[in-house]
From Swiss-Prot:
The gene is rplP. One of its GO terms (molecular function) is rRNA binding. Signal peptide: none annotated. The lineage of its organism: Bacteria, Thermotogati, Thermotogota, Thermotogae, Thermotogales. Pfam families: Ribosomal_L16. This is Large ribosomal subunit protein uL16. One of its GO terms (biological process) is translation. InterPro entries: Ribosomal_uL16, Ribosomal_uL16_bact-type, Ribosomal_uL16_CS, Ribosomal_uL16_dom, Ribosomal_uL16_sf. The keyword rRNA-binding applies. The keyword Ribosomal protein applies. Keywords: Ribonucleoprotein, Ribosomal protein, RNA-binding, rRNA-binding, tRNA-binding. GO terms for cellular component: cytosolic large ribosomal subunit. Part of the 50S ribosomal subunit.
Length: 142
């Protein structure tokens, strides 16, 4: 699973996901990309599931870039514990994804394979996404 090697503080506040993504909104490395259309926390497990789905379709051809990294810890209190007594333990890591952010990029495969792979990866995420190409940044909704 993806997670930071070290962090300055173990726990973070939740924060808010307002507005659109500031950076990472264009396909910079590959030919095809998967773009988020809504804000969400994407967990390390969801990123890994998407990566596996893409690699399963592409087999051993092509190259994949993961453009998001889960650097925010999220906490959870144990089941059946009363409120209070401090913040819960770190349960996992998430990446804060805002609308417009490119999540995955792929290259080295034909158009049909790229679209099929990104469609499978899109099904692993809790948000609507669209497939975009380097030339056509408008894309098609998935």
């Amino acid at each position: 699973m993806l997670m930071p090697k070290r962090v300055k503080y173990r726990k973070q506040q939740r924060g808010r996901m307002r507005g659109e993504a500031k950076g990472g909104t264009t396909v910079d490395f590959g030919e095809w990309g998967l773009k988020a259309l809504a804000p969400a926390w994407i967990t390390a497990q969801q990123i890994e599931a998407g990566r596996i789905a893409i690699m399963r379709v592409m087999k051993r051809s092509g190259k994949l870039w993961i453009r998001v990294f889960p650097d925010k810890p999220y906490t959870k209190k144990p089941a059946e514990s009363r409120q209070g007594k401090g913040k819960g333990n770190v349960e996992g890591w998430v990446s804060v994804v805002k609308p417009g952010k490119i999540i995955f990029e792929i290259a080295g495969v034909d158009e049909n394979t790229a679209k099929e792979a990104l469609k499978y990866a899109a099904s692993k995420f809790p948000i609507p996404t669209k497939i975009v190409s380097r030339s056509n940044i408008g894309g098609e909704a998935v």
